[in-house]
């Protein structure tokens, strides 16, 4: 399908150095790749720098941001610039469509899902449940919660649109992928601007606001207030911070 246009991609503005902060976690990757089943031909929609892209399969990657695609590894799958709402592929071109942490950036969720259905019989979506937020959002950045809730529907509605099951994706305490909820047991990491650079939810908020809230987090860590509330998290192996897989039936 053709004829759709899109504004300047978000990640053309916030994606510099993204690949350094966002290294796919192997445990999360294993769950995603298992959900793909025996699919051999896979389109990775919203692929960015290539996180969670399956190996040993024929993959085509698509992303609206040339800046993000430029950060892909030299041996990564071939990639094209495009948007989810108008995939430049024929009907049934793939065995499966994968979309990882990208749905909340789409301009038209229903159109994007229709396109996934058009090009592949099996769909695997790695996303998050807006009903479950990590403490960094609820306690320090409620503006992030408001922003996501405004743009993204509840997970049961998205699952119904896909006719998909929902699988919880637990996040390890030592998760290598620096998304917003990854440091639930390592709060000091949020104080590092280089770590925050890989978190789209933070990069789309006013940076003076972010700095002031991180100053408050630093003060809570120094005083012991954070550990009084959440210190038990430091010893946990994994936690449900709202991430999930949607897998078509």
Report residues per predicted region.
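Conserved class I S-adenosyl-L-methionine
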Residues: 1-43, 51, 66-71, 122-156, 177-179, 191
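Local beta-strand N-terminus motif with an aromatic residue
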Residues: 39, 94-95
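Class I SAM-dependent methyltransferase SAM/SAH-binding core
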Residues: 41-87
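A conserved beta-strand element that flanks and buttresses the S-adenosyl-L-methionine
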Residues: 98
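Short catalytic micro-motifs in class I SAM-dependent methyltransferases
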Residues: 101-105, 127
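A short glycine-rich, Lys/Arg-flanked "PGG" loop and its adjoining helix->strand segment in the class I
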Residues: 110-123
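Conserved Class I S-adenosyl-L-methionine
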Residues: 166-249
């Amino acid at each position: 399908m053709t004829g759709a246009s899109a504004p300047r991609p978000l990640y053309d503005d916030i994606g510099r150095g993204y690949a350094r902060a966002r290294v796919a976690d192997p445990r999360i990757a294993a769950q995603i790749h298992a959900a793909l089943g025996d699919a051999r031909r896979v389109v990775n929609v919203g692929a960015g720098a290539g996180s969670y892209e399956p190996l040993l399969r024929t993959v085509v990657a698509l992303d609206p941001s040339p800046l993000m695609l430029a950060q892909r590894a030299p041996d990564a799958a071939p990639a094209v610039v495009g948007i989810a709402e108008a995939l430049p592929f024929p009907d049934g071109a793939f065995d499966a469509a994968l979309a990882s942490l990208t749905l909340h950036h789409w301009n038209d969720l229903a159109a994007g899902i229709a396109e996934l259905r058009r090009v592949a019989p099996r769909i695997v979506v790695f996303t998050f449940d807006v009903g479950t937020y990590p403490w960094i959002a609820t306690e320090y950045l409620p503006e992030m919660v408001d922003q996501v809730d405004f743009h993204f529907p509840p997970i049961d509605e998205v699952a119904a649109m896909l006719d998909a099951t929902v699988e919880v994706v637990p996040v390890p305490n030592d998760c290598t992928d620096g998304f917003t909820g990854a440091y639930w047991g390592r709060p000091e990491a949020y104080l590092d601007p280089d770590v925050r650079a890989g978190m789209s939810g933070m990069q789309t908020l006013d940076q003076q606001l972010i700095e002031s809230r991180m100053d408050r987090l630093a003060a809570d860590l120094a005083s012991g207030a954070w550990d009084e509330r959440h210190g038990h998290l430091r010893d946990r192996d994994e936690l449900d911070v709202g991430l999930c897989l949607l897998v078509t039936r």
